Amino acid sequence: MKPGSWPSIGLIYLYGVATSASLSKIIPLQGDFAAQMGVTPAGFSLLLSLLTIPPALLAAAAGSIIDRIGSRTALIAAAAVGVIANLAYLLAESLAAFQFIRVFEGFIMVGAYSGAPALIMATAPPERRGRAMAFWSTYTPVGISLGLLLSAGFAGTAQWRGGYAIHLVLFAALLVAGFTLPRPPPVPLVAGAPRARLLAAWTQPGPLRLSLTFGMLVMMGFGLNIVFPAWYAAQHGASMGEASSLLALGNLVMIPGGLLAGTLLARGRRDYPLLLVLMIAAALISLPLLMPGESRVLRLLALAAWQFESGAAIAVVVAGLPRVVADARQGAAAAGLLSQVSALITFVTPLVWAPILASGQWPWFVLVVATSAALALLLFPRATSAPG
């Protein structure tokens, strides 16, 4: 496969999609875990978060290692972990087994979230790199939607693990396809202590601030994905399966938002003013989206607007990754830092949003959104010149 071509970028993109599905495929199954294993809402929030432990602890250091062993190898390994994890889910018989597998499954994120953007940055030509990274950013909505759809049709049935079987097949296909991935150009060895090189990304202000900005978007976006099915079901008398399917379809609206943002950036639009508009929009849209008593139509329109804005904001932030990386051939460390910070935020997010859902105090939802948006604007590293 030709390095830097759109087909190769598209294949790399699929690893991000399948990995994001790992995060969300469990959400429609909350009732099944309660019925089958007596899992409480707090226990389910913990189960949801366990996936993020490996990237939260290891992603930045693993990214530095991936810069040496090769991002292609990392993606093949991630797909292999996906096959093993989903097979184990099908065989698990206890909550403890699910918890252990959920942690193991997090190693997919360690490999894919560092390896995939690094391989794109290393192989895409400079004139295509920014748009390719904006396209890459849409893996989140597509993957989250895929995960919700994988399980939504099986939720509440005797075959409630059916989504895990489908996910296994998807990762098996990616494992085979991984051997057709392009090989990145060789990376020069850098002098210095090995431990210092592993932690170098944490000492670079550009990647660190960009990663923290992305973490604020995770707090908003993933938080909504956690609470919306139950919130919508309670407000409108819908089932969890129906609410999860609506959210999955709504997440797809993030794709045109991300692509539009990528197009605007490629045409010279500055990223910070664009992010400013998007964060103000997020705070305003959260009101009709989460306020009790709104009509079904208004809430779904607000959901579509929210997802469009979220997709655009993610694209703006992710497209800044090549700008803050000193050498495009060594992007895995910076991508790993972004993954590690976002994983830490992902771990905390259910612990912030789930208690608000349980209390029914919806103004706290809006406060979390507004605070996260303000922090994103403060943290985002501004470009010194207009993007080319």
Which residues make up each language-model segment?
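Extracytoplasmic gate region of multi-pass secondary transporters
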Residues: I27, P207-A248, I255
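Conserved MFS/SLC helix-loop-helix module at the cytosolic interface between two early adjacent transmembrane helices
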Residues: L57-E93
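Helix-to-loop junctions at the C-terminal end of transmembrane segments
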Residues: L58-G70, G257-R270
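Cytoplasmic membrane-interface "Motif A"-like loop-to-helix N-cap segments
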Residues: R68-A78, A266-I280
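Cytoplasmic helix-loop-helix junction between adjacent transmembrane helices
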Residues: I101-T140
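Helix-loop-helix hairpin linking two adjacent transmembrane segments in secondary transporters
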Residues: F135-P182
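C-terminal transmembrane helical hairpin of 12-TM major facilitator-type secondary transporters
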Residues: Y272-V317
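A late C-terminal transmembrane helix in Major Facilitator Superfamily
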Residues: V325-Q361
